[in-house]
Amino acid sequence: MTQNPQWLWQEVLTKLEQQLSRPTYETWIQPTAIQQWREDEIVLCAPNAFVLNHIQKYYGALITETIAELLQQPVKVRLTSPEGNTLAATQSFYSSRSGQSTRPGKKTPELNSKYTFSRFVVGPTNRMAHAAALAVAESPGRDFNPLVLCGGVGLGKTHLMQAIGHYRLDTQPDAKIFYVSTEQFTNDLIVAIRKDSLQTFREHYRTADILLVDDIQFIEGKEYTQEEFFYTFNTLHEAGKQIVLASDRPPHQIPGLQQRLSSRFSMGLIADIQPPDLETRMAILQKKAEAENLNLSRSVIEYIATHYTANIRELEGALLRAVTHIAISGLPMTVENLAPILNPTVEYAPAAPDVILQIAAEATGVSIEDLKGASRRREISTARQIAMYLMRQHTDLSLPRIGELFGGKDHTTVMYSCDKIGQLLTKNQKISQLVSQISDRINHHHQNL
C-alpha cells in the first residue's frame, strides 16, 4: 500500500466522526493532524499538551484500533505536541481473520478504571458510605449485606460501587465480580426468556462472589424482573456472597417495589450520600486537576466550587468545559476568563447582600450591627472577614461596594479580608467548615426562592 498520510488520516477522521459525539469530535479529534507514517508507526500531532494528554487518556486506544483496522495490520501510534511532549497512544492487536481488534489476557468486569477508593474524595456528606463500601470490599458478605448506596445523580454511588469491585480484584484476582445496571439485568432476562435459556441466566448471576447492581430503582413495576431478582438475591445472600445496590432513593420509597424485596434491601445497611459541601467540592476539583496534570490556582478552584453545588458530575463537567476552552483559546486560566465561559451554563444569580449578612450573623453568633461596625475583637473581626469573603463569592459586587455595605470600609480592607479567609480555608479546619456551612446555606436559600 502506498503510504499517503493525509489519505489515511482523513479515513480515520471519517470513522471517528461516526463514532463520537459532535462536540467530542470537534474539540479533541478534529484539531489533531497526522505528522508522519513510516512502516508500522504513525505519529500524530495535537495542538497543545493538554489536548495531547486528553486524547492519550480517553481516545488513544480508539484511534489506534481504527488505524489498525484500516491498514489491516498491527500499528503503533505516537502522539506529540508543539511543546515537544510525546506519548504513546497504545499498540493494537489486530486479528486478520475476524477483521476486529482483540486484546490479550483475561476478561475483566465492566469497571471504570478511574473509579477506585484512592480517587474518591471523602467528606462529611459521604463519609459513612465510603467507610461502609471499604468495609464490604475488605470483608465481603459479612457486616453490611446488602449494602445499599442512596443518593441523587452524580454524587459518587457508582464510583464507590465500582471501587469495591476493583479492590476485590486487586486482592483476589479470580473473584467473580458482576457489575450490572438494572436495565442490563432486565435485558439479559428478556433475552433468556426469548432463547429459552433461563437456567443459563440464573446460573450466571447466581455464581457471583460480589453482585453490584446500579440504579435498582428502575426495577419498579417490572414484576417478572423483581421475581427473578428476588431469587437471585436469596441464593447469593444465603451463600454468604456480597450484594451492593445503588439507588436514588431508599428502598421503601421505590414505588411498585415488592414488599419482600424492600424488606431484603433494608436488612443490611442503607448508606446515604448527600451533595458535597464547599470544602469537599474544592478537594474534588483539586484531585481532578492533579490527576489531569492541571495547574489550577486556588481562586479558580474556589470559583468553580462555589458556582456548581448540585453534584460531582456537574462539578467535573464545569472543570472540563473551562479547561477545554482555555486550552483551545490560549488564554490564561483566571477567574476573569472563566466567568464568561461558565456563567451562561450555570443557573446562578447573585445572592442578596442582606441575606448573606443575615445568614453569616446567625452562623457566627455576631450581630449584623457588629459585622458592619468597627470592633476589633477577634471573634467579631473574624466573623466580619468571613462575611466579606462570602459577599465576594456570592455576589457580583465590587470591592468598594462591599466595603460600603460593611459600614464604609475601604476596598483594601475587603481585599485583605477575602485573601486572609481564602488562606485560612486550607489551614484552619474550623474556619473552613464554618465557611462551607454558611456558603451552602446561602445557596440553599437562593435555590428555594
Swiss-Prot record:
Residues 90-103 have a biased composition (Polar residues). One of its GO terms (biological process) is DNA replication initiation. The keyword DNA-binding applies. GO terms for cellular component: cytoplasm; plasma membrane. Residues 1-73 are annotated as: Domain I, interacts with DnaA modulators. One of its GO terms (molecular function) is ATP hydrolysis activity. Residues 73-109 are annotated as: Domain II. Pfam families: Bac_DnaA, Bac_DnaA_C, DnaA_N. Residues 327-449 are annotated as: Domain IV, binds dsDNA. Signal peptide: none annotated. It is found in: Cytoplasm. Residues 110-326 are annotated as: Domain III, AAA+ region. It comes from the Bacteria. Gene3D superfamilies: 1.10.1750.10, 1.10.8.60, 3.30.300.180, P-loop containing nucleotide triphosphate hydrolases (3.40.50.300). InterPro entries: AAA+_ATPase, Chromosome_initiator_DnaA, Chromosome_initiator_DnaA-like, Chromosome_initiator_DnaA_CS, DnaA_C, DnaA_dom, DnaA_N_dom, DnaA_N_sf. Residues 90-110 are annotated as: Disordered. ATP binds at G154, G156, K157, T158. Its main location: cytoplasm. SMART domains: AAA (SM00382), Bac_DnaA_C (SM00760). Keywords: ATP-binding, Cytoplasm, DNA replication, DNA-binding, Lipid-binding, Nucleotide-binding. Oligomerizes as a right-handed, spiral filament on DNA at oriC. Domain I is involved in oligomerization and binding regulators, domain II is flexibile and of varying length in different bacteria, domain III forms the AAA+ region, while domain IV binds dsDNA. Plays an essential role in the initiation and regulation of chromosomal replication. ATP-DnaA binds to the origin of replication (oriC) to initiate formation of the DNA replication initiation complex once per cell cycle. Binds the DnaA box (a 9 base pair repeat at the origin) and separates the double-stranded (ds)DNA. Forms a right-handed helical filament on oriC DNA; dsDNA binds to the exterior of the filament while single-stranded (ss)DNA is stabiized in the filament's interior. Belongs to the DnaA family. NCBIfam families: DnaA. This is Chromosomal replication initiator protein DnaA.
